[in-house]
Amino acid sequence: MNLQPTQQFFEHDGLRLSYWEWGDPREETYVFVHGVRDQGRSWDYFFEALLRRGVPIKHAVALDLRGHGDSEWPSSTRGYQHEDFLTDLAGLLKHLDKEPATIIGHSLGGSMCLLYAAAFPEKVKRLVLLESLGPFARADEEVPNIIAERLRGRDYVEIPFPHESLESAAKSLQKTFPLIPDEAALHMARHGTNFRGGRYRWKHDPILRYRTTTAMSEGQIEAFIRRLQCPILFVYGTESDFMKSVRGHRAQLFPNAKIVPVEGAGHHIPHEKPEELADIVTPFLMNGN
């Protein structure tokens, strides 16, 4: 298989969405969905690590969610609700006309994969969740602050292209996620930035720095989890606090889940520990359980 993916586009929900494709579209499909402020090429190192271990992936696609990568931005922050991101995944699978598929998601992408697998259990063969056990629930009293933050975000002042080099963009990523190695951060900068006038900026919509989704209730999320039917692998980083507050409670609700930590990894496991992650995910994909 050629390790350089081909970029494809499709029209969905009034937006032109991008995805990256490897292999033969006539074969069984594996779908990769990134997290917030990330993009489809974030899977490159992990995907290559899976192939080196003999995982028989002959067709794979990695979606750029709306507002990320080379996908278009919606005209309003209301276009970044859970249902909006979920419809991107549903639209891609409808466009590919391939089911059931194995779907692999990180963070926000994992939440969308979970919701999709619960809504359409017959369309998902296997589910891999990286640093995600579904969307965050918020207490009722938090929702007004989330709405206010989203409204304030409309008035953000953005330096159009703040980075003088790819290395500068990579360092900005590592300030937030210091466990991402230099090589991986630079790879993300190469594929995740736009260049204009001698300077760089990350491709994602700047509004995504704010909480743009109005949270679901814990009861609603648990109802989705109870509908899951396929084999599930949940992987988390031992150095990550993401989802830590609900990890124990939510994990008990999953009917068919295997839960495995990656030692020394933070939130961005595919960037930080692609080889170790592939060691964990490979037997699940090879055996289906």
Model feature map: region roles:
Residues M1-V31, L51-H59, K98-P100, T282-N289:
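Alpha/beta-hydrolase fold catalytic core
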Residues S18-W73, R250:
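Conserved HGGG/HGGXW glycine-rich cap/lid loop of the alpha/beta-hydrolase fold
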Residues E99-V143:
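Conserved hydrolase catalytic core segment
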Residues H12-L15, L51, V55-I104, L108, ...:
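Active-site loop/oxyanion-hole signature of alpha/beta-hydrolase fold enzymes
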Residues A265-P274, A278:
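Catalytic histidine-centered segment of alpha/beta-hydrolase-like enzymes
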Residues I159-G219:
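Conserved alpha/beta-hydrolase catalytic His-Asp/Glu region
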Residues F195-Q252:
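Conserved serine/cysteine hydrolase catalytic core
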Residues L130-L133, A137-P162:
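A catalytic-pocket lid/entrance helix-loop region that shapes and gates access to the active site
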